[in-house]
Amino acid sequence: MLQIIRGKLVIFLITLCLFVVYLGFDNNSNSDIVFYGHKTPKSVEIYLSEKNIIYKIINDQKISRGNGHFISIMVNNYRTHCGVVDINLNFFNDILYSVRLKNISKLENMEFCATKQRVYFSDKNKKASYKIINYGDYYDVDYYDNNLKNEVFDWIGKWS
């Protein structure tokens, strides 16, 4: 009888240890892209390269009217608190003004994921706003600085 209890205790302890190791691995693998101090395309590219994150510049155009230009950087299949998503970083006049998490599964808790991720896309002294976009099968979440977003829309309204 004592042998059976001892055997079950050993199995329980091994299972508990494996579970703790799994939780530690799962939390460490949830490393997010953090943009504190990285607000220009060049500094974001350097940051992504240092972290061995594969990215591509998907749009680089200088608008001849006025003094504005847009650059977007895309990071595909990146693990976040919202699951594995694509991330689109949008710059206006070399300042990061918008970050979009794309193709978030309907299975995710959107309020938790959106508020948890918001911290990583804002400056240390202020919080970014966010908007959840429901496409039926999946979600996108936009994070943005209200002042910069208004400046972008004002520029677009003036020159379009």
Curated annotation (Swiss-Prot):
Coiled coil: none
Record-given protein name: Uncharacterized protein YdcD
